[in-house]
Regions:
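Exposed acidic/Ser/Thr-rich ligand/metal-binding surfaces
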Residues: 28-41, 160-380, 407, 440-452, ...
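Soluble, acidic/polar mature domains that operate outside membranes
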Residues: 73-78, 384-398
Length: 550
């Protein structure tokens, strides 16, 4: 069987299973219980469409990346379609940030976000021959998936700040303002001792190749990185929760691996009781001045005990006060509760990643282990004050669920995002320079706003954060020059990712006539130094989306 035939197997089996279920329904099988559906994932493309020349070309390019699933695993996967035929993936649909007139709202405030789960999840949809639902696309997580060459701190602060202004590729009348933050890095050997609790969902919904088997392989990658001073506990939950492994030294790697290997899936999902028990184990193994973190591996399909969103989120908020962070690692398809996974990590002062293959697991838990585990700054907030003499309108690209009130910036009681060692954070504003055509009609009776400060300043950037050890917040202020020039590769590439995220949502109200072909060309020309092939992979994903949209 050719590799291309193997890549076509999943849509074929999915189509076969759906036809089989329709036939059964026609024989009189019915249900009186009507299930309320959250936003459904996009339906798989027809086989004829996936066999077209554009899609085949895009799929062939993907062969250079991690190998596809074997035919045997795909066949096993198809046997579970009876409960997978009704997509139950849950996403939060947030409207795009609005356009603001500087004369009316000169200040923009938001919390940083270092999550990257949206990008990996979107990649999963495209690799399956499907376009992602709108709610799965979070622009800031897609942009922040990639590393950028930002300046490191030189003044003793935990991160450096970079700004850049250049032309917008999709609108000749606007400019892109890029704000970049680069946290100081640390080698794994330099990290404080770690007390880690692996909290694993072993319920029936995880009994599939991309569920528990991938979780086990992922956790064993992390086990290989453990040091003697680290300790690990293993807690599992299905219908009930239990401790599989008490706090164990990182030197006992064989013992930890054996405990992971023995895990099997089956039963309902009492996620809340598992989280409670995991925090209990974290307290039992707590390391003063160390890294204390729970890593929750699940599809988020909680259905026993406390399962409502607000109660689970409040539980994470309450427990973070104990000094234990919560990282969520998303696995699985069809019943995946992405909204819960992202919000639990935010509430638990952790980070969220989606693991769609072992390569992504290595990126998160090996290549970026220091970023995943070690916090260098807490409650990081960004505030931009635009100069009305230079800018008439602006909009923040992404960060819709991170918006803060202006007064929240100076309030240390308001929670915000954490930044890990080596993390990069990117924020993009699309701005309308004074005198250029904007999105909003000018007011008839409004007077011209007066400039304050230096007229050469485009804006003032303020960054507020707390040290990793806690305490009062500190402030960094940087004026942003109105000088714009040739865009760097980093800005051009991040602009391509931002364009792609907007194009996937489909309405094109901001990206105008810029096509997916234009986006792929821009990203291809801005790949620069790409040691891990991440930017090249992005180009291929854009090409796949282009084929699927035709």
């Amino acid at each position: 069987m050719s590799p291309l035939s193997t890549l076509h197997l999943r849509p074929f089996f999915q189509g076969f299973a759906v036809v089989s279920l329709i036939a059964l329904a026609g024989c009189g099988l019915s249900s009186s219980r009507e299930v309320a559906k959250p936003e459904a994932a996009a339906v798989a493309a027809p086989l004829s469409e996936l066999s077209s020349q554009p899609v085949q070309g895009a799929l062939v390019k993907r062969m250079a990346l991690p190998a596809p699933m074997t035919a045997r695993l795909m066949a096993q996967d198809s046997t579970a379609m009876a409960y997978r035929s009704e997509p139950r993936e849950q996403y939060a649909n947030l409207p795009d940030n609005p356009v603001h007139r500087v004369a009316e709202t000169p200040v923009s405030t938001f919390s940083v976000d270092v999550d990257t789960g949206s990008y990996a999840n979107v990649r999963r949809f495209l690799n399956e021959g499907r376009l992602p639902p709108d709610g799965a696309v979070r622009l800031e997580e897609m942009v922040n998936y990639f590393p950028y060459g930002y300046a490191l701190p030189t003044d003793g602060s935990p991160f450096g700040v970079t700004t850049e202004v250049a032309a917008t590729p999709w609108n000749p009348d606007t400019q892109l303002l890029r704000i970049g933050i680069k946290a100081s890095d640390r080698a794994v050997a330099q990290l404080a001792p770690a007390n880690l609790v692996f909290l694993v969902d072993v319920s029936g919904s995880m009994d599939r190749p991309e569920g528990l088997p991938l979780v086990k392989s992922t956790l064993k990658l992390l086990v290989d990185q453990l040091r003697e001073q680290d300790r690990v506990s293993l807690v599992v939950y299905a219908g009930e929760s239990r401790v599989v492994l008490k706090p164990t030294s990182g030197r006992d790697k064989a013992k930890i691996r054996n405990a992971i290997d023995r895990l099997t899936a089956g039963g309902s999902t009492a996620g809340a009781s598992g989280i409670e028990l995991a925090y209990q184990m974290a307290r039992e193994g707590f390391i003063d001045n160390g890294i204390n973190r729970i890593l929750l591996a699940t599809d988020g399909d909680f259905n026993v005990g406390v399962s409502d969103f607000d109660s689970l989120k409040q539980m994470a908020v309450d427990r973070r006060k104990s000094g234990v962070s919560l990282t969520t690692l998303g696995f699985g398809v069809d019943n995946y509760n992405e909204h819960l996974m992202e919000q639990l990590a935010d509430a638990g002062d952790g980070n969220y990643a989606y693991i769609d293959n072992l390569r992504e697991a290595r990126k998160v838990l090996v290549d970026q282990l220091s970023s995943t585990l070690a916090i260098v700054a807490r409650d990081v907030k960004l505030q931009v004050e635009f100069n009305p003499a230079q800018v008439s309108e602006y909009r923040l690209l992404g960060y819709e669920n991170r918006a803060l009130k202006r007064e929240d910036f100076n309030n240390d009681k308001v929670d915000a995002g954490e930044i890990g060692a080596g993390h990069t954070v990117t924020a993009l504003y699309e701005i309308v320079p004074k005198g250029k055509k904007g999105w909003i009609e000018p007011l008839r009776y409004a007077g011209e706003p007066s400039a304050s400060g230096s007229s050469a300043e485009l804006a003032m950037l303020r960054v507020r954060y707390k040290p990793a050890a806690g305490g009062e917040s500190r402030l960094i202020e940087r004026p942003i020059s109105n000088a714009s020039g040739k865009a760097s590769d980093d800005l051009r590439f991040s602009a391509a990712v931002a364009a792609f995220a907007q194009q996937l949502k489909g309405d094109g109200r901001y990206t105008g006539s810029m096509s997916l072909s234009d986006t792929a060309a821009l990203a291809r020309s801005a790949r620069g130094d790409d040691p891990f092939g991440l930017r090249n992979e992005f180009v291929q994903l854009v090409e796949m989306a282009q084929a699927l949209k035709h």
